[in-house]
Amino acid sequence: MRIGHGYDVHRFGEGDHITLGGVRIPHRFGLLAHSDGDVLLHALSDALLGAAALGDIGKHFPDTDPQFKGADSRALLRHVLAQVQAKGYVVGNVDATIVAQAPKMAPHIERMRALIAADLQVELDQVNVKATTTEKLGFTGREEGIAVHAVALLVRP
């Protein structure tokens, strides 16, 4: 068994939606990023890579590489899974916490879980996503961006 932790942050910028867990969520801002800015999938990818001792997403998908400009983070997550599987691991479970003052995540969490489970080739009950605020404290509380913490458990079958 191996565990990994991932953390990612993206700041808000111009836009009319954000993408989290593969779900497009209407919002008065977008997230600034080289890829599609899916901070949830980036944190999950880092957790999986960390658990398998494969580095981080910056190593695998550098923001200096034009090939990843606007990249679909679901495709990146599936690529990460393939690397993890190549080392003989399968996903035991993943758990993520979205830290954001807005928008409200509750209406979107079940769809996020379903998409993540599909991409990771696991059952829905092996994926947990939750959200919290910082009670208007810090950069997330001032609605300057979104942060996500994620953990992953990998097992060898």
Curated annotation (Swiss-Prot):
Its cofactor is a divalent metal cation. It comes from the Bacteria. It catalyses: 4-CDP-2-C-methyl-D-erythritol 2-phosphate = 2-C-methyl-D-erythritol 2,4-cyclic diphosphate + CMP. GO terms for biological process: isopentenyl diphosphate biosynthetic process, methylerythritol 4-phosphate pathway; terpenoid biosynthetic process. Keywords: Isoprene biosynthesis, Lyase, Metal-binding. The record marks H34, T133 as: Transition state stabilizer. SUPFAM superfamilies: IpsF-like. A divalent metal cation binds at D8, H10, H42. It is an enzyme of class 4 (lyase). Binds 1 divalent metal cation per subunit. 4-CDP-2-C-methyl-D-erythritol 2-phosphate binds at residues 8-10, 34-35, 56-58, 61-65, 100-106, 132-135, 139, 142. Homotrimer. Belongs to the IspF family. Involved in the biosynthesis of isopentenyl diphosphate (IPP) and dimethylallyl diphosphate (DMAPP), two major building blocks of isoprenoid compounds. Catalyzes the conversion of 4-diphosphocytidyl-2-C-methyl-D-erythritol 2-phosphate (CDP-ME2P) to 2-C-methyl-D-erythritol 2,4-cyclodiphosphate (ME-CPP) with a corresponding release of cytidine 5-monophosphate (CMP). This is 2-C-methyl-D-erythritol 2,4-cyclodiphosphate synthase. It comes from Stutzerimonas stutzeri (strain A1501) (Pseudomonas stutzeri).
